Amino acid sequence: MASVVTKKSKKSGDTINAKLALTMKSGKYVLGYKSTLKTLRSGKAKLILIAGNCPPLRKSELEYYAMLSKANVHHYAGTNIDLGTACGKLFRVGVLAITDAGDSDILDA
């Protein structure tokens, strides 16, 4: 029974990765903590993705700004290395703000 649960969570992780890859190709996004905060303060961010190993203080600050700007927050299941790989980058990505999803339906998830 536990294997079914892990398969389901792995599948949802795969779908978020696929949607994220499509957003990277066709949408607009901002990588990094400082740039994400600027995007949140200007009200342009629609979705924030936070890596699982992001420090708690930084995570709570991002959630607070997202609440003020009415942006959705998604806590990515993997680490910042996994999030960077899912974005198609060769570096770590701790925080990511999506301003325009493009052809992807990641904002509906």
Curated annotation (Swiss-Prot):
Pfam families attached to this UniProt entry: Ribosomal_L7Ae
Keyword Ribonucleoprotein in record: yes
GO molecular function, one term: structural constituent of ribosome
This protein's record includes keyword Lipid biosynthesis: no
BP GO annotations: cytoplasmic translation; negative regulation of gene expression; rRNA processing
Protein localization: Cytoplasm
GO CC list: cytosol; cytosolic large ribosomal subunit; preribosome
Superkingdom of source: Eukaryota
Alphabetized UniProt keyword annotations: Cytoplasm, Ribonucleoprotein, Ribosomal protein
Subunit structure: Component of the large ribosomal subunit (LSU). Mature yeast ribosomes consist of a small (40S) and a large (60S) subunit. The 40S small subunit contains 1 molecule of ribosomal RNA (18S rRNA) and at least 33 different proteins. The large 60S subunit contains 3 rRNA molecules (25S, 5.8S and 5S rRNA) and at least 46 different proteins.
Function comment: Component of the ribosome, a large ribonucleoprotein complex responsible for the synthesis of proteins in the cell. The small ribosomal subunit (SSU) binds messenger RNAs (mRNAs) and translates the encoded message by selecting cognate aminoacyl-transfer RNA (tRNA) molecules. The large subunit (LSU) contains the ribosomal catalytic site termed the peptidyl transferase center (PTC), which catalyzes the formation of peptide bonds, thereby polymerizing the amino acids delivered by tRNAs into a polypeptide chain.
Family that this chain belongs to: Belongs to the eukaryotic ribosomal protein eL30 family.
Miscellaneous section: There are 2 genes for eL30 in S.pombe.
Annotated protein name in UniProt: Large ribosomal subunit protein eL30A
Annotated source species: Schizosaccharomyces pombe (strain 972 / ATCC 24843) (Fission yeast)
